[in-house]
Every structure is written in C-alpha cells, then in structure tokens.
C-alpha cells in the first residue's frame, strides 16, 4: 500500500517554506506579519461575538495562515508546467482576469484549493499572471523578449522529475514531498542577477516595468505574499509606526458592518540591487508585502451592483477622501446579512443549529422562517478569489507611482486556457454549488 502525503499537507509545507524564504529575502514582510497578527489578536479580544462566529464556522484556525502569493510568467510552457506543479498541492486554476483593461499587460488566474475541506485546512492560493507579449508595441523588442524567455527554464530538472513521478504514481511519499517543496521553491526564489544587459532591461522597462520584471530574470520570483487581517484600516494606519511605507489607497470596497469581497493594501515595493550581464549594476523594483481583508462572496447580482457602485465612486486623491467617497456611494449596497440574503446579493453556507437538529426542517417550511426560528444558521461564504481592478491597482502602485497605462488588449480567455492546457473553473459556479450543497445537508433543497 502506498503511503502518499495528502495534497493539503504538501500545500501547507510549501506555503510555510515560501513564507520563511520570503521573510529572509524581504525582512519587512516579517514585520508586516507581526503587525497583522497583533491587529488580529486585538480584534478578536475586542469582539468576542466575531471570535465565536469564526470558531463555529471553522474559520479561526485558517486566519493566521498566509492567504496568497503572486507570480508572473512569460510563456505558455511555463504556465502549463505551473498548473502541473500546483496540482501536486491540490491547487486548481479558478477564474480568468484580464488586467490589460487596467493598463497591465497580463492576464491571470488563481491557483487555489476548491473543496470546503481543503480550504479549511489551508487556503493558500497563488495569483498567476501570463505576460501578453503581443501588447509590446515595438515588434523588434517583442521578438527579443520572446527569444530571451525561450532560453530560460524556471524549473529545476529534479522538480520536473518529481512532477512526472506524482503524475505516474498518483502521489508523493513523505521524503519525496519534502524534496518537491525544496525544488519547487527554487522557481520562486529571487535572483539578483539579471539574464540581460542593462540596455535591454531599460528598453523593456520603458514599455512597462512589469514586462522587465517578467523577462529579465531567471525565475518567476514571488512578487508578494499576503496575510489576512480582520481590520485593514487599522493595519494601514499603524504601518508607519512599524517603519513600513503603505501604498496610498486601500483597494476594493469601503469599510462595512458586513465586509464584502476583498480589500487590499500593501507596503511599497523595495528597490533592490541587480547585476546585469555586462557587469553593470542597477536596481529593480517589484517585490512587496500585501495585506487583505476578506468578506462575503457576492452572487452575479451582487457583483453587478458592486461593479456599478465602484465605477460611480471613482478614485479619491488620498485614502481618507477615497474611503469617504466609497462609503457615500456604497450606501446603496445593503449592509446587513438579512438583506444580502433576501435580495440574493451574497452567497451563504447553511447549517443546522442544535435546535434545528432536534427539530429538523419539514417539507414546506421556508428558509427565512427556519433562520428566524434559530433552527438554521446562515454563515457568509468567504470570498476566495480576486478583483482585477484591485490587482491592477496593487501592481501599478508597486511598479512606481508613475502611471504606465498601455493600450488595453482584448480579453482572451480562450488564448489563456490554450496556454494553460486546461479550462479555468468558474468561481461563481463553485460558490453556488457550495450554497446548494449546504441547503441539501440541512434537509432543504434538491441535490
């Protein structure tokens, strides 16, 4: 009998190893982790009802686990191999994001666990972007970038062998899993030596700094890791006290009684020394630490309302003005769980209370009545995915405050999936299935 390690266990080992590596490479990220943990502890101490709810919904244990990282790759082969690598860790491609609409020349997906059980064990996810070389205006430069990318291999031979072994055997044993984590980590390690000369780097950087970040280095170095906080506004306000320079605006929706979707901020990317191929030295700015506060996942109806209000709000000159404007506009978005539920704006996970187990639902009883009677408890489903406008805002602000908008490309999910070698899953279908399955477990709704 084979004794294979579970994908969840391998994912946990990998996320812990990546966190340790990133704290060594970017010490300020370790400081950020300390700040977030202190803020979370304070929130839980001051809000016992929130703590009790997180415990009841099995959310508390996963709170202090890292929530996501982000990488960028240059070729279809790199993306397809990453899909196979992440499959070893139980992470599947979910969602398609076209960041070119916001002036960033990439399109993306999120590799993440999809089952409720896997998300509870470790919700680690990696936002993965593929460079769109066709958005480089200069044909000569585009061809040069493609040639540079064709010469590199971002995976070690041992990593490729272990992926193949996993595919043949259907799993990895303990020692092989450790070796896999060690080898996979090399793909995401920072290298201060560029694969190009300074002139090429500058030419690509002038097209877009992100293009230089993808093309000019030997691997797809992790460009940020992101812990989860319960109060992102407090973290943002405390960052300067910890010697951390925050980005100007918190991305996403405003502060609310019932948080929705995803709010994100970060510290500004570090300027790091680089040695180029002709021996020249310079600097590169790309890597940073991010913080996120996750709320309830929205239905298509809720998401349409969110997108409309966000567009109406625009962008404020500073964070205080921006948040005030958002708060004003988002008064039109219901801010209590009952309204979100009854207007079908958000997804919920339903479970029987002790009272409900003693007196199970009977045919014909409405969900609203069962909730009012305390026989069914409705927990908001945590949003597990990303927001393209927020992701683009984070990327732009950490590639320098100078805007580098390019001509937007047409969204091409088909091209992305062809490069990936597989379809991406629809996040809305996953949330809908989770809500429906929870209703079935309660004895209402059809399987």
Indicate where each model-derived feature is located.
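Extended, well-ordered protein cores
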Residues: 1-447
């Amino acid at each position: 009998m084979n004794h294979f390690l579970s994908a969840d266990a391998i994912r946990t080992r990998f996320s812990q190893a990546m966190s340790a590596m990133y704290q060594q490479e970017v010490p300020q990220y370790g400081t950020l982790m300390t700040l977030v943990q202190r803020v979370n502890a304070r929130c839980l101490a001051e809000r016992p009802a929130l703590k009790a709810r997180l415990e009841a919904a099995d959310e508390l244990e996963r709170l202090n686990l890292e929530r996501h990282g982000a990488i960028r790759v240059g070729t279809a082969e790199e993306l397809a191999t990453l899909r196979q690598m992440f499959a070893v860790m139980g992470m599947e491609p979910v969602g398609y994001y076209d960041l070119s609409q916001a002036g960033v020349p990439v399109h993306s997906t999120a590799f993440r666990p999809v089952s409720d059980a896997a998300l509870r064990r470790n919700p680690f996810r990696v936002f993965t972007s593929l460079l769109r070389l066709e958005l480089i205006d200069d044909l000569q430069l585009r061809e040069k970038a493609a040639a540079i990318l064709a010469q590199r291999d971002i995976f070690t031979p041992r990593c490729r062998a272990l992926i193949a072994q996993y595919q043949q055997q259907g799993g990895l044993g303990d020692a092989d899993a450790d070796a896999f984590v060690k080898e996979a980590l090399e793909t995401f390690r920072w290298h201060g030596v560029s694969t190009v000369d300074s002139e090429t780097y500058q030419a690509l950087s002038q097209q877009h700094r992100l293009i230089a970040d993808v093309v000019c280095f030997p691997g797809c170095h992790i460009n940020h890791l992101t812990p989860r906080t319960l109060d992102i506004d407090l973290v943002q306000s405390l960052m300067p006290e910890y010697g951390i320079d925050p980005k100007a605006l918190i991305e996403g929706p405003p502060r609310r009684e019932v948080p929705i979707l995803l709010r994100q901020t970060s510290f500004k990317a570090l300027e790091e020394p680089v040695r180029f191929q002709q021996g020249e030295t310079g600097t590169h700015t790309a890597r940073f630490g991010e913080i996120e506060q996750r709320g309830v996942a929205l239905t298509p109806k809720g998401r349409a309302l969110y997108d409309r209000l966000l567009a109406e709000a625009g962008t404020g000159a500073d964070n205080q003005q921006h948040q005030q404007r958002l708060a004003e506009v988002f008064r039109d978005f219901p801010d209590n769980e009952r309204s979100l539920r009854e207007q079908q704006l958000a997804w919920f996970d339903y479970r029987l209370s002790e009272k409900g187990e003693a007196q199970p639902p009977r045919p014909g009883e409405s969900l609203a009545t069962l909730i009012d009677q305390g026989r069914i408890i409705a927990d908001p489903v945590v949003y597990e995915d990303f927001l393209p406008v927020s992701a683009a805002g984070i990327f732009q602000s950490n590639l320098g405050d100078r805007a580098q908008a390019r001509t937007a490309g047409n969204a091409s999910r088909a091209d992305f999936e062809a490069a990936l070698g597989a379809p991406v899953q629809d996040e809305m279908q996953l949330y809908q299935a989770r809500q429906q399955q929870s209703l079935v477990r309660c004895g209402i709704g059809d399987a």
